[in-house]
Regions:
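N-terminal FAD cofactor-binding segment of flavoenzymes
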Residues: 100-156
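FAD-binding beta-loop-beta segment adjacent to the flavin cofactor pocket
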Residues: 284, 338-357, 411-419, 428-433
């Protein structure tokens, strides 16, 4: 599947590896050393039920992030509603996926309007990618830091070295490049929020919160996890990946600056914290770290997947204990981020009039939370499909065009792949800390082709079956018993869904 990525290298696309992020003010300590303090706890149930609501947390660190929201210095050609023109494509959402589709559709000579409440705002989160994925897109210049490989700490004694270079995206440069291509292709921008869409036979009316109505032949929802335009008709009960991260200046840290820390499952930092240790044994969290120097590092405590998600305050509390145990003293915080990523769950109604991409189209990797390789493949597929059907000699209705685009976005092989990934998520949901360690011990013992392909969504059902059998053969006897005991019901469900889902 490496060729699939390379086939679209001209697009210049990355979809963010994040769900909802929110910046919070952090209180300053009166002491010389900066430690962490937590306030009262609040329920997170409301924003897990409604992904349109951002994560809230009263738990705070003692430092104020220094970086403020930043906008690109670029002049945008704005949409003129007074002309009453019907554009070929309206893209709702100015994230990487939306801009990528806008870029390629406009390159084919079609008219595009990008609608976003903050079109110049630089994306807030730190994006990490495997270097080979960006190399396939000719986007290596958009990586501001690379590491020769990665390391996984399973416990105090066991670690895995991953011989696969990793990089951090320069999100400002990436957005600038994508915006420049959109502008040169004639994309128009409208700074507003879409609150309603009314569909007619051959066009749709997008009603914005500023009173403007944008008319378009096709509507693309690229708003992430909001689920505000794309419709679902099945109960929505995903797993949740929850993470809290900081980009910080520290006095020192113990990590090799030549390798990023992909996962650190060690729990010795909770030895004297019985309640946290018990919770971590049942639903574990790991540290993800990108060291830029001996004193500057991105640190993120992550719950891989849980249902319901681990409360943000608890994620922060575990992170505090870990950093203290590692002797990491934070001097200042450049940025902080809170992420909640819905994983798995049903696909949206297929087909439907509004086309989706990214999180709103169910494209998050259900086992890992990754979307990069998946969206790399999907953005040009969506764009090419839109160009093809809008330019068709046979006059298609709005419903017919959208149905064809959805069919290209979610062909049977992609739906089957997603079913397998959901099966993997269901197994991970049932594993405790020890089971998770055993699972990843076997996972990273696989041939690189298979764990690379699994993480980057490059394996399809025949290879995924071999992947599963290989993983089972690599696992310890204890892990095999555990997989059989906890994976039988999810396996039966997966097989049933595969049988029912036919073209």
């Amino acid at each position: 599947m490496g060729t699939l990525l390379r086939a679209h290298n001209k697009l210049g696309l990355l979809h963010p590896l994040h769900g909802f992020a929110e910046k919070r003010n952090l209180l300053c300590s009166s002491e010389g050393q900066h430690h962490f303090r937590f306030g009262s706890k609040r329920s997170h149930r409301t924003w897990w039920r409604n992904p349109c609501v951002r994560a809230r947390s009263s738990a705070v660190l003692e430092l104020v992030p220094e970086t403020k929201k930043e906008n690109l210095e670029v002049e945008l050609p704005m949409y003129d509603p007074s002309k009453g023109l019907v554009v070929d494509l309206a893209v709702v959402g100015g994230g990487p996926a939306g801009l990528a589709v806008a870029q390629q559709v406009s390159a084919a000579g079609l008219s595009v309007c990008s609608i976003d409440p903050s079109p110049k705002l630089i994306w807030p989160n730190n994006y990490g990618v495997w270097v080979d994925e960006f190399e396939a897109m000719d986007l290596l210049d958009c990586l501001d830091t690379t590491w020769s490989g990665a390391v996984v700490f399973l416990d105090e004694k066991t670690r895995k070295y991953l011989d696969r270079p990793y990089g951090r995206v320069n999100r400002k440069l990436l957005k600038w490049k994508m915006m420049q291509k959109c502008i040169s292709n004639g994309v128009k921008f409208h700074q507003a929020k879409v609150i309603k869409v009314i569909h007619e036979e051959s066009k749709s009316l997008l009603i914005c919160n500023d009173g403007v109505t944008v008319q378009a032949n096709i509507v693309l929802d690229a708003t992430g996890f909001s689920r505000c335009l794309v419709q679902y008709d099945k109960p929505y009960n995903p797993g949740y990946q929850v993470a809290y991260g900081i980009l910080a200046e520290v006095e020192e840290h113990p990590f090799d600056v030549d390798k990023m820390v992909f996962m650190d499952w060690r729990d010795s930092h909770l030895t004297n914290k019985e309640e946290l240790r018990e919770k971590n044994c049942k639903i574990p969290t790991f540290l993800y770290a990108m060291p830029f120097s001996s004193k500057r590092i991105f640190l993120e405590e992550t719950s891989l997947v849980a249902r319901p998600g681990v409360p943000m305050e608890e994620i922060q509390e575990r992170m505090v204990a870990r950093l203290r145990h590692l002797g990491i003293k934070v001097k200042s915080i450049e940025e902080d981020e809170r992420c909640v990523i819905p994983m798995g769950g049903p696909l949206p109604v297929l087909p439907q009039r509004v086309v989706g991409i990214g999180g709103t189209a169910g494209m998050v990797h259900p086992s890992t939370g990754y979307m990069v390789a998946r969206t790399l493949a999907a953005a040009p597929v969506v764009a090419n499909s839109i160009v093809q059907y809008l330019g068709s000699e046979r006059r298609l209705s709005g419903d017919e065009m959208s149905a064809e685009v959805w069919k290209d976005l979610w062909p049977i092989e992609r739906r089957r792949q997603r079913e397998f990934f959901c099966f993997g998520m269901d197994v991970l949901l049932k594993l405790d800390l020890q089971g998770t360690r055993r699972f990843f011990d076997a996972f990273f013992n696989l041939e690189p082709h298979y764990w690379h392909g699994f993480l980057s969504s490059r394996l399809f059902l025949p290879e995924l079956i071999y992947f599963g059998l290989s993983l089972f053969s690599q696992a310890s006897n204890t892990s095999r018993i555990e997989i059989m005991a906890k994976g039988t019901v999810p396996l039966v469900n997966m097989i049933g869904n595969l049988i029912k889902d036919r073209d």
